[in-house]
Amino acid sequence: MIAYKGMCPGMICLGYQLKMGLNVTEQANCQANGFHCAANPMDCLRYYGDFQNSEYYLVRPCGDLDEDAVDSRISCTQLWVLRKLEPQEFFLHALAYMADHPQMPDGCDVKRERAQAWNGYAVVRGKHPRAKGKLGDILAFAREAVNGPKIEHLSLCVIDGKERLPDVW
């Protein structure tokens, strides 16, 4: 299983220093302990929402696993930290998750049909998704089929001031 983990810069999570590779702890309970991660990348933003001052990693949860009904959160006793995701990669993974799981909740910060970037990004899903943002913002789009929630098209762009202009839908 592949999952995602948000952290403070330097791979710090609630005061705990993680490292690349295998990290081990004794217990896993989503409410209290263990290494936490999420199956849906967007759920990381619920816990590490300051996108400009957080880091996001591709991880593999192992050992004892615990899940709860809050979101796609997972707690585990063994967490393999595989690699850091660049901002655009993070949102591409989020779009892929939506396409692979069209019936699942979209996760934190996914807007329906129309979104304005905030905190450096906008993720929008719908029949005719539109978004706008400031210079440097990342815009991620998931277009649904006309007759259902299946994702037909994914796209991602960065407002660069040349091909993609600021504050234009």
Roles of regions detected by a PLM:
Residues 1-169:
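Short, glycine-biased loop/turn motifs at secondary-structure junctions and
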